[in-house]
From Swiss-Prot:
Its main location: membrane. The lineage of its organism: Eukaryota, Fungi, Dikarya, Ascomycota, Saccharomycotina. Residues 1-17 are peroxisomal. Disruption phenotype: Lack of this protein causes the peroxisomal-deficient phenotype and mislocalization in the cytosol of peroxisomal matrix proteins. Belongs to the peroxin-3 family. Pfam families: Peroxin-3. The chain crosses the membrane at residues 18-39. This is Peroxisomal biogenesis factor 3. It is found in: Peroxisome membrane. The keyword RNA-binding does not apply.
Length: 441
């Protein structure tokens, strides 16, 4: 038999095996290619997911840091307003100092003319007594009010920013889901039997845009109303602090006159007692006193506040839908009533105490006259002037100071208190809440 015939005969006999082998090899190659493709695709998706998670974390971190900066900028904007409120409520220390200078000039003129018609010395003594009392009241009131204001602002902005972030994330997810549905060919083929998908999509987009615009305006007004709650402590709430502090100062400094002398340690001890007794009245069970200082007690107080901060059109629109506002206020109230908030506010007040004692001590020592370097006791009049200067520094702001580099040292000190940052992070990262919010005290 010829070789060619033997080869053909061999192939014919093993043709089935060859075909099976080739088919198996092709199947293995195809399967391997598919497996490699899906593995690469899975790895790509995993890498993309990790990248997205990292981006989201960085975005959340940047938004958090920006929110804390915005809180500080807000305080810079509010301080000049409250400074005017203090001056209107008879706590303008510069006015008293001006009157003292006028009295000194009048006394000089009276001596030169040998006039006996008036007794400026008595009036001057009254002014010094007034300066002593009001400088103490203003200094302590400023520490409590500004500490509370920066805490309230942090809570407000972190709650609001987190809420906005959640809303935007939900809307983005819904948009992606809708887009995926429209891109699904089978879905489009089925729906095309009873309607034109393009017309339906256009109508839905128009209606959604109108609805979104209306809801966006309502949400914006609700958020503005929520932010305007700081009006309360600047115009009403601080008066509660002022009343408590005034009573404590009158008790602690009773019988201490401007010419009487105290050491820095004695002055610090008396001031410590004032802070301790004030804290005991503010931080009671459930922080009810603190809540009434920071927020209106009832709906009538809330309505009065909103009438002072919103224009007529915005107020009308607000009353048509207050859902978002009520949700935000409920969470803010729960935050204020929590133990964590009490701890943070006490930390801010303690930091304020150390700040003012350091400043008052430096300013008092600096007022020593030549030859008095070893003097350890100072007249209350000297303390009063030092406290006046300290108050001025604590409330000092210039136009755009927070952006231009002119920093209020007191605000910078409070802004760097670690428990405040911890509470802010806790509120901001409370992503377990839904639109109804649920902060745990």
């Amino acid at each position: 038999m010829a070789p060619n015939q033997r080869s053909r005969s061999l192939l014919q006999r093993h043709r089935g095996k060859v075909l099976i082998s080739l088919t198996g090899i092709a199947a293995l190659f195809t399967t391997g290619s598919v497996v490699v493709f899906f593995v690469k695709r899975w790895l790509y998706k995993q890498q993309l997911r990790i990248t997205e998670q990292h981006f989201i974390k960085e975005q959340i971190k940047r938004r958090f840091e920006q929110t804390q900066e915005d809180s500080l900028y807000t305080i810079y904007e509010l301080l000049p307003v409250w400074r005017m409120v203090l001056n209107e409520n008879d706590l303008n220390l510069d006015s008293i100092v001006t009157q003292l200078k006028d009295q000194k000039n009048q006394l000089t003129r009276a001596k030169s003319s040998e006039s006996r018609e008036s007794s400026p010395l008595k009036s001057k003594a009254e002014l010094w007594n007034e300066l002593e009392l009001k400088s103490l009241i203003k200094l302590v009131t400023v520490t409590y009010t500004v500490s509370s204001l920066i805490l309230l602002t942090r809570l407000q902005l972190n709650i609001l920013t987190r809420n906005e972030y959640l809303d935007s994330a939900i809307k983005l997810t819904m948009q992606q889901e809708n887009c995926n549905k429209l891109q699904n060919r089978f879905y489009n083929w089925v729906t095309s039997w009873w309607s034109d998908p393009e017309d339906k999509a256009d109508d839905a987009m128009v209606m959604a845009a109108k609805k979104s615009k209306k809801e966006g305006q309502e949400v914006y007004i609700n958020e503005q109303a929520f932010l305007s709650l700081s009006w309360w402590i600047l115009n009403k709430g601080w008066l509660s602090y002022n009343e408590i502090i005034t009573n404590q100062i009158e008790i602690e400094f009773d019988g201490i006159h401007p010419r009487d002398t105290l050491t820095l340690e004695e002055f610090s001890s008396r001031l410590t007692n004032i802070f301790r007794n004030t804290n005991s009245q503010i931080f009671q069970q459930n922080n009810n006193n603190l809540t009434s200082i920071l927020l209106p007690k009832d709906s009538s107080g809330q309505e009065f506040l909103l009438s002072q901060t919103l224009d007529a059109d915005a107020l009308t629109s607000f009353h048509s839908n207050t859902l978002v506002f009520n949700q935000l206020v409920n969470e803010l109230t729960q935050c204020i009533e929590s133990t964590a908030t009490s701890i943070v506010l006490e930390s801010l007040i303690n930091e304020s105490f150390h700040f003012i004692m350091n400043k008052v001590g430096i300013k008092t020592i600096a007022k020593k006259k030549p030859g008095q370097e070893d003097q350890q006791q100072y007249q209350m009049a000297v303390f009063a002037m030092s406290m006046k200067d300290c108050c001025q520094e604590m409330l000092q702001t210039t136009a755009g100071s927070s952006h231009s580099g002119s920093v209020n040292e007191y605000l910078a000190t409070l802004d760097s208190v670690q428990p405040l940052d911890d509470l802010s992070a806790s509120v901001y990262s409370n992503f377990g809440v839904s639109s109804s919010f649920s902060f745990k005290p």
